[in-house]
């Protein structure tokens, strides 16, 4: 990361990446998968949670809780991973007045930045395509991670109707390709082999 007015060129930082991202495997199973969280920079379980029809496509629904329980309450919030070596953006000390919290206005208070998220993925089990996604995330500062004090951002996002339609069409196209590669081509190659 660079500060304002930094004359040094930007540098790339490698990010270790474990778990799934952007899609699930072909022939997705009804089980738990590790799914990479880009904010926490590590994988968290995406648990199979049932089947659901999305625009005429039978999908598997998976839920992922990052630092929250099934109801969305903080149970183990993630300390926000810093982009700086000294964790300058992870903990901040300033006055109670600046934080906007009760107490002596000039009292210096140190708070840590935390993050929680709850996601739901609707996945085509044949192609592994995520056809719909919902995410609720909360970024906040607190002295105790289980007691948010200053909200940085709290949002809920869901795939748009247009995105869902596009992803369902992509999943259907991918299903056709999977069928071609797993059924038609092996039979064709076997027939060619027998003729030769």
Give, region by region, the residue ranges found by the protein language model:
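Extracellular or lumenal secretory-pathway regions
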Residues: 1-30, 137-138, 157-196
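Membrane-proximal extracellular "stem/stalk" segments
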Residues: 85-86, 93-186
């Amino acid at each position: 990361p660079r500060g304002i007015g930094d004359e040094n060129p930007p540098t790339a930082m490698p990010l270790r990446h474990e778990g799934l991202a952007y899609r699930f495997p072909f022939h997705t199973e009804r089980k738990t998968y590790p799914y990479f969280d880009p904010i926490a920079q590590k994988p968290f379980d995406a648990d199979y949670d049932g089947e659901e029809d999305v625009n005429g496509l039978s999908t598997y629904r998976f839920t992922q809780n990052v630092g929250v329980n099934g109801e969305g309450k903080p149970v183990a919030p993630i300390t926000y991973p810093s982009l700086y070596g000294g964790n300058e953006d992870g903990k901040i000390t300033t006055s109670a007045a600046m934080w906007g919290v009760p107490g002596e206005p000039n009292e210096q208070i140190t708070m840590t930045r935390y993050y929680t998220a709850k996601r739901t993925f609707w996945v085509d089990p044949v192609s592994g395509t995520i056809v719909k996604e919902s995410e609720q995330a909360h970024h906040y500062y607190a002295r105790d991670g289980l007691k948010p004090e200053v909200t940085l951002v709290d949002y809920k996002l869901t795939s748009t109707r247009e995105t869902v339609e596009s992803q369902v069409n992509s999943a259907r196209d991918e299903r056709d390709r999977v069928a071609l590669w797993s059924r038609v081509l092996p039979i064709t190659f076997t027939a060619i082999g027998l003729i030769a």
